[in-house]
Amino acid sequence: MPQSIYRVDKFVVPIAAREEFLDRVRRIHAFLKEQPGFLQDFVLEQFSGPGEFNVVTTVEWASQETFENASAVVTARYREMNFNPQETLARLGIKADLANYKRLEA
């Protein structure tokens, strides 16, 4: 049975960039929800505690294969839109930590 893959992206978002950033995240997640293998997502905003990252997004994919397929579709879509995520993050002054995770038994 394939193991779920979790895409977890953590961001330090300046207050001045918050609305534009969250609007972009919502649009991206709406597109991700249409992709085969999408299981669930969360967009989380820190409200207390000493953590560095104030916005965290997660997407659970059914398998490594569905994650890779969705990544290819998203990359192609960005190319069509002439959208460069790294340039947007730099322009908005956002620090990002992007990674894929698998679940461990507790």
Q: What residue ranges belong to the model's regions?
A:
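Basic/polar N-terminal segments that are highly enriched at the extreme N-terminus
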Residues: 1-2, 106
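Short, well-ordered beta-strand segments in beta-rich or mixed alpha/beta enzyme
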Residues: 5-12, 43-75
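Short, surface-exposed ligand-recognition loops at beta-strand->loop->(often short) alpha-helix junctions
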Residues: 12-22
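Residues within well-ordered alpha-helical secondary structure of globular protein domains
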Residues: 24-27, 73
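Short structured motifs
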Residues: 26, 40-43
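An amphipathic, aromatic/His-enriched active-site/gating alpha helix that lines ligand/cofactor pockets
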Residues: 31-39, 60-98, 104
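A short acidic, often aromatic-flanked loop/helix-cap motif at beta-alpha or helix-coil junctions
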Residues: 50, 101-106
